[in-house]
Amino acid sequence: MDLWVVILVGVLALLAGVALGFFIARKYMMNYLKKNPPINEQMLRMMMMQMGMKPSQKKINQMMKAMENQTK
């Protein structure tokens, strides 16, 4: 085979691999976020109420800030 055919096949295979990897990773992340949604203020408020605590806005803001700092 000619050199340009080998290079063309290699580039096409690389592009196909990148595209396929992107879509597989996107599908995986969408399924992951559907099963494990990120915690928002409303969910935090419900958790505190279930634990018997009275959720004040100040406590919720502190807990949200603590979770944001923990993920950094």
Swiss-Prot record:
Transmembrane segments: 4-24
Gene Ontology CC annotation, any one: plasma membrane
Membrane topology: Single-pass membrane protein
Keyword Membrane applies: yes
Compartments it resides in: Cell membrane
InterPro entries hit by this protein: UPF0154 (IPR005359)
Keywords per UniProt: Cell membrane, Membrane, Transmembrane, Transmembrane helix
Family: Belongs to the UPF0154 family.
NCBIfam families hit by this protein: PRK01844.1
This protein's name: UPF0154 protein BLi02038/BL02936
Organism: Bacillus licheniformis (strain ATCC 14580 / DSM 13 / JCM 2505 / CCUG 7422 / NBRC 12200 / NCIMB 9375 / NCTC 10341 / NRRL NRS-1264 / Gibson 46)
